[in-house]
């Protein structure tokens, strides 16, 4: 099916403070809050990486980067507009909890297939 994939990169995180466990809890807290008001839970995959930007950008960008990958599943949420609004609210909630760090978001059109467990 045709759908959208969002990638949310949050840069400049301090690995001595922000761990994978903390990132998971932060996303879950924001997603549960949005779900309570909209009925839409925004699932995400979390990957960690390291951003290297050298002297061209602000030095605090160097460091741990959290990459959340989100796929809109039209079978679960029919309205793209409603999903996008819920997604935006979750990302804003995550940013608030983390102290408004640098964030990049990409949105890609993709073909998405999945198989349920039998």
Label every PLM stretch briefly.
Residues 1-24:
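Short, extreme N-terminal segment that most often corresponds to the first beta-strand
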Residues 35-79:
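Short, intrinsically disordered low-complexity segments
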Residues 9-11, 47, 71, 106-108:
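A structural detector for beta-sheet-dominated domains
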Residues 118:
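Short terminal or interdomain "cap/linker" segment that borders an active site or interface and mediates
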Residues 72-115:
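Short, compact, well-ordered microdomains
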Residues 23-28, 62, 83, 87:
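Glycine-rich, flexible loop segments associated with nucleotide phosphate handling
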Residues 5-8, 66-67, 103:
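Hydrophobic beta-strand segments of well-ordered beta-sheets in folded domains
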């Amino acid at each position: 099916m045709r759908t959208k994939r969002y990638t949310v990169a949050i840069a400049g995180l301090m690995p001595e403070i922000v761990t994978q466990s903390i990132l998971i809890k932060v996303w879950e807290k924001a997603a549960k809050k949005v779900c309570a008001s909209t009925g839409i839970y925004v699932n995400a995959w979390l990957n960690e990486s390291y951003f290297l930007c050298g002297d061209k950008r602000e030095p605090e960008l160097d460091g741990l980067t959290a990459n959340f990958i989100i796929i809109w599943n039209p079978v679960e949420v029919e309205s793209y507009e409603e999903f996008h609004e819920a997604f935006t609210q979750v990302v804003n909630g995550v940013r608030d909890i983390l102290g408004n760090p640098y964030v990049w978001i990409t949105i890609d059109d993709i073909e998405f297939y999945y198989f349920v467990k039998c």
